[in-house]
């Protein structure tokens, strides 16, 4: 069964992603030194972890569904690995599109590490771990252990000189280099692995009552993990070199707890709202929206307004851009319908 509140939560990540990118690309530099912009960026910082977390959930749910339809665990794991490699391949196609539109050094443009690169490799790791388990709870333990391990070794990976000998394009995947990418496997893969663990629990909830009880437990667990992460941030660091906002496991677990808590929040909201959900529709178009909006926000198409809008103007542009992207997503759906059925269907987008 398709869980609408997961689509809704993905749609929220889409809206937050657009906010983060438009404000970052279009706001004047001297308009960024206030609490409104600062809080907007903190909220925007949850988009990428949200996408990774939800991708892990989707992987686990898809695997469980295939097993129930009679496919062997070996075939299911192979399909999950294949999908991860497709996402990894799409990352390079996305970078190629960016270079064709905006230019620049072709090698650096194609090899720059973006979230799709990290998502693809993280999905591959989750698929391999899923294949190691013989039962659902074995797999959940693998995911939980890997989540904690990736988070805890992140400060060590960032600081160790042992990785200096790696070829630059490989090193960009394990620690960030300015201009070569923001996303790295450490700690970002842990969000997807944590999502896969949550997805395995969700997959076990096969009745409405079971899913309701599970979301209550998710609320308790999310609050506990977030509170523990926040409390641990006040303790002396156990690492020689770490930064709270980038490599700290305490910040990771704070965010992971909030992401887990977002599941019951989305579940409760969607239980109350029974009408059409624009947010769910946005969520189902997340890859398409990501694909087209990044180049519009940062590329040559909007060059004249890069870092030139006041904060109020940037928020207005963000709202208009979001509406336009939703319209583009519905237009894409119309084109797909026309392609599949031979006639254009009304979408009711606006």
Task: Spell out what each predicted region is.
Residues 1-350:
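Alpha-helical transmembrane segments and their immediate juxtamembrane cytosolic regions
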């Amino acid at each position: 069964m398709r869980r609408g509140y997961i689509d809704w939560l993905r749609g929220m990540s889409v809206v937050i992603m657009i906010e983060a990118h438009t404000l970052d690309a279009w706001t004047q530099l001297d308009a960024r030194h206030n609490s409104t912009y600062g809080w907007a960026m903190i909220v925007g910082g949850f988009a990428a972890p949200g996408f990774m977390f939800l991708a892990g959930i989707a992987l686990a749910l898809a695997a469980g569904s295939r097993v129930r339809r009679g496919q062997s665990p070996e075939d299911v794991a192979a399909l999950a690995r294949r999908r991860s490699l497709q996402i990894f391949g799409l990352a390079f196609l996305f970078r190629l599109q960016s270079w064709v539109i905006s230019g620049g050094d072709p090698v650096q443009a194609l090899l720059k590490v973006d979230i799709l690169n990290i998502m693809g490799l993280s999905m591959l790791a989750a698929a391999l771990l899923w294949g190691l388990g013989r039962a659902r709870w074995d797999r959940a333990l693998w995911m939980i252990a890997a989540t904690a391990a990736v988070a805890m070794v992140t400060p060590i990976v960032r600081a160790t000189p042992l990785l200096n000998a790696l070829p630059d394009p490989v090193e960009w995947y394990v620690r960030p280099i300015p201009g070569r990418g923001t996303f790295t496997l450490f700690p970002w893969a842990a969000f997807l692995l944590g999502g896969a663990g949550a997805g395995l629990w969700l997959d076990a909830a096969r009745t409405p009552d079971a899913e309701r009880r599970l979301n209550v437990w998710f609320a308790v667990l999310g609050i506990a993990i977030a509170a523990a992460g926040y409390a641990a941030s006040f303790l002396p660091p156990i690492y020689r070199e770490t930064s709270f906002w980038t490599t700290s496991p305490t910040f990771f677990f704070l965010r992971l707890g909030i992401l887990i808590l977002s599941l019951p929040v989305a579940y409760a909201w969607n239980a109350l709202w029974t009408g059409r959900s624009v947010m769910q529709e946005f969520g189902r178009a997340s890859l398409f929206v990501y694909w087209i909006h990044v180049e519009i926000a940062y590329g040559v198409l909007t060059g004249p307004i890069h870092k030139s809008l006041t904060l109020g103007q940037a928020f207005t542009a963000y709202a208009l851009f979001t509406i336009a992207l939703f319209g583009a997503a519905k237009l894409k759906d119309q084109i797909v319908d026309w392609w599949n059925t031979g006639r254009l269907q009304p979408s009711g987008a606006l």
